Every structure is written in C-alpha cells, then in structure tokens.
Amino acid sequence: MSDLFEINHFYEKIISDYLSNGFCIIDSWLTYEETTQLRKELNHFYDADCFKKSAIGNRLNENLERSIRNDFIFWLDETKHASVFFKKINSFIEYLNKTCFAGIVTKEFHYAVYPQGSFYKKHIDTFQNDDRRTISIVCYLNEIWNESFGGELKLYLNNQTLQIFPTNGKIILFDSKTIEHEVLSVLTENKRLSITGWLKTN
C-alpha cells in the first residue's frame, strides 16, 4: 500500500463516529498556536469592517432576517486566508474521498463572529434550491470561553438534544441534510469566534 493510502487512525475515528451518530466532536483539532494565528487574522478583518451581517439562504439567494440570525461573517478565500485551517481540512477531504468515496468536490467556509446578544435560531443547513451541502463543520477560535458566556451549539438528535461548549480548537462535524441545530445567545461582551462551513458534493 502506498503512503497515500495508509490508514490514518485519527481520521478513521472521525469517520466512524460520524457514520454511527451523524456527528463527531474533536476537542483539540487545532493547536493553541494555530488558533492564535487564525484568531489574529479574524480580528484583523473584523476590526477593518470587512465582515457583513449574516443572512439566511445560500450565497446566491440571501435574505437578511435578524429575528433568525444576527451574527457577522467573512467568506474565506482559500488562496488568501486561514492557511493552517485549509491545510488540515484538505487533508481530511482527500482521505474521506479515497476511503469512503464521499464525492466531496468543493467547500465553502467563513469566519463567524457572534457579539453579545447574537444567536442563530433552529435550522438545517441545506436549501430547497441547493442540497449540495453534505457535512457541516464548525471550529472554535476563542482563547477563553466560560460556561456562563453562552453561545453553545445545540444539536437536535432524534429524541434528545446535545449542547456543545465552544472551547478553543474544538471542531464539530455533522450531517448537513438531517441534523437541525442552533447557536444559543451569547451572554458576554466577549465575541464568540469560529470558522464555519460545509463540504459539498455535486
């Protein structure tokens, strides 16, 4: 077996959890140094007023609806932004396609900032006019985040719910087509920072 097809036990665990549960949580997917670098870049663009108010719908059919979501986003260009993040994501996509024939052909990611009082109500990540999103991904970049700060990701899983605390370097993958979810209101003056996006098929 060539090096390109060697079994990666870390990726295998992610895939196994995802296939069993419809989601997977990895607590330290990014190192402290990597999140520091990404957070610095995010804050640079946020301070330069490059972020825009979030919308519902896909990028071709957006509508502002502040009662549903009111975070701020900055779309990432892989050739210019978040290089340490994309290096890891691309490695995982390559492995996923080779071992599971997942058919991931493209991706889209943005930085997301949730100031105090912001939220994203219960929703699903696919659209009536576009169902190419397959795997949703959220990666957290806050250096410090206490439980009293709010901003948890809440997944609706069959007969139960799961609230995920946004700790630094944690990544969550879940099924874009089936898992409803929401971001609970941020209760602190500290902004909730993340990279959020989707792996997509044709």
Language model segments and positions:
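Non-heme Fe(II)/2-oxoglutarate
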Residues: S2-T99
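Extracellular structured ligand-interaction cores
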Residues: F23, T106-E108, G117, T134-V138, ...
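Conserved short histidine dyad/triad with adjacent acidic residue
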Residues: A82, Y111-Q128
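Short, conserved, surface-exposed binding loops centered on an aromatic residue
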Residues: K98-I104, T126-D131
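A short coil-to-beta-strand element that immediately follows conserved catalytic motifs
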Residues: A102-H110, F149
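Short acidic/glycine-rich loop or secondary-structure boundary segments that cap or lie
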Residues: V105, F119-K121, E147
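Catalytic core of Fe(II)/2-oxoglutarate
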Residues: Q128, R133, N142-N202
